[in-house]
A protein has these predicted regions:
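Active-site cofactor/cluster-binding pocket
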Residues: 1-233
Length: 233
C-alpha cells in the first residue's frame, strides 16, 4: 500500500493532482481511495488531498491518511509542506515547490514570510528526525532536483531516513514555457514519478492527464511533465 498526501493553496490544483494520481493507479488495477480537506476560502485557503493506493492488491477501507504514516508528501507551496509534515512517515519522502504564495496575513506580520527560510526549516526538521532515529549521517537534500539523488532510504542499523526533494519550480516554469505555472501540480507529480518514488511510469501519468484534464489544457500539462522529467535527467 502507498499513501500519498498532497498539500497546496486553493487554486493550485491540489485536488486535480490527486485525481490524476488516482486515475493512474486505477488504470493499473489498484484499489484507490481519496479524500480532500479544503480551507475556508476556495482560493488562498489550504487544501489537502489524501490518496491511498493498494499497489499490492490490498483492500483499502478508509480514505484518510493518519499522521505519521504517509509514504510521501507532495506540497505545491513550502508553507503547506510545513503544515503537512506531521503526516510524513519515518523514512518518507517530502517533495515541495520552493516558491511561496504569500498569505494576506503575511503583510500584517512583523516577520516576513520567506520561502527560503521555510525550505531550510523543513530540511533541518527532517535532519533532526533522521538523527533522532539514529539513521544516516546526513539527509539527501539538494538545492534543486537532480538525476543522481541517492535512491536509498535505509539508514544505519536499519533505521529509515527521510528524503527531502525541494523543487526549483521557477526554473521548471521557465523551462516549460508560458502558462506552465498553472501546471505546477503536474510538474511535482512528474518529479515524484521520475525520481522513482511512485511506482508509476511517466507514460501512465500522461495517460491519466489525458483522462482527467480538459482537452484544451492537456498539451500544456504534458509539456510541464516533460520539463520536470527532463530536469530530473
Amino acid at each position: 500500500m502507498i499513501d500519498i498526501l498532497l498539500a497546496g493553496v486553493g487554486g493550485q490544483g491540489t485536488v486535480l493532482a490527486a485525481k490524476v494520481l488516482a486515475q493512474a493507479a486505477q488504470s493499473k488495477g489498484w484499489q484507490v481511495r481519496t479524500a480532500e480537506t479544503i480551507g475556508m476560502a476556495q482560493r488562498g485557503g489550504n487544501v489537502t488531498s489524501h490518496v491511498r493506493m493498494g499497489s499490492n492488491g490490498e483492500a483499502i477501507y478508509s480514505p484518510l491518511i493518519t499522521p505519521g504514516t504517509a509514504d510521501m508528501v507532495i506540497a505545491l507551496e513550502p508553507g503547506e509542506a510545513a503544515r503537512a509534515l506531521p503526516y510524513l512517515a519515518p523514512g518518507g519522502v517530502l517533495v515541495t515547490a520552493t516558491t511561496a504564495i504569500h498569505p494576506v496575513t503575511a503583510a500584517l506580520a512583523s516577520q516576513p514570510y520567506r520561502a527560503g527560510d521555510v525550505v531550510a526549516a523543513l530540511a533541518n526538521s527532517l535532519q533532526a528526525e533522521a538523527s533522532r532515529e539514529q539513521a544516516a549521517e546526513s539527509i539527501v537534500a539538494p538545492n534543486t532536483v537532480t538525476a543522481d539523488q541517492d535512491a536509498s532510504t535505509d539508514g544505519v542499523e536499519g533505521y529509515p531516513v527521510p528524503l527531502f526533494i525541494p523543487v526549483d519550480d521557477e526554473a521548471l516554469v521557465r523551462e516549460a514555457g508560458a502558462g506552465s505555472r498553472k501546471s505546477l501540480n503536474m510538474m511535482l507529480l512528474a518529479v515524484a514519478v521520475a525520481q522513482g518514488r511512485v511506482p508509476l511510469t511517466v507514460d501512465e501519468l500522461k495517460d491519466a492527464v489525458r483522462a482527467c484534464v480538459k482537452p484544451q489544457f492537456v498539451t500544456m500539462n504534458l509539456a510541464a511533465i516533460n520539463a520536470a522529467v527532463e530536469a530530473c535527467g
